[in-house]
């Protein structure tokens, strides 16, 4: 399964619709034990839609839960970071099994 953010569209931020697609792709990957490749160039959640992006298991926090659940189940997750990786977007590579970052083009808030 490939899940991607596009920084040329609203900075790659997660909106209500974006996170629903992200979570649905994770559910399909989990149900079918498919490896996941995240293509990350993300500005995190769109804070102006916080009440629609964060609230429950099918929203932003649920994506992180699903990453942890897949990791515990042995489903490989690889993050390829192509640019910014700020706020909640930094958790995607941090929770992945392997991370590939483009030299001099990638930054993550991960310590």
Regions found by a protein language model. Name each.
Residues 1-6, 21-49:
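A structural preference for short, pocket-lining loop segments at secondary-structure junctions
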Residues 16-23, 60, 92:
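Amphipathic alpha-helical transducer elements in NTP-driven molecular machines
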Residues 4-11, 72-76:
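Glycine/charged-rich beta-loop-alpha catalytic/anionic-binding loops adjacent to active sites
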Residues 36, 40-111:
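Conserved catalytic cores of soluble enzyme domains
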Residues 8-17, 50-57:
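Flexible beta-alpha connector loops of hexameric P-loop NTPases
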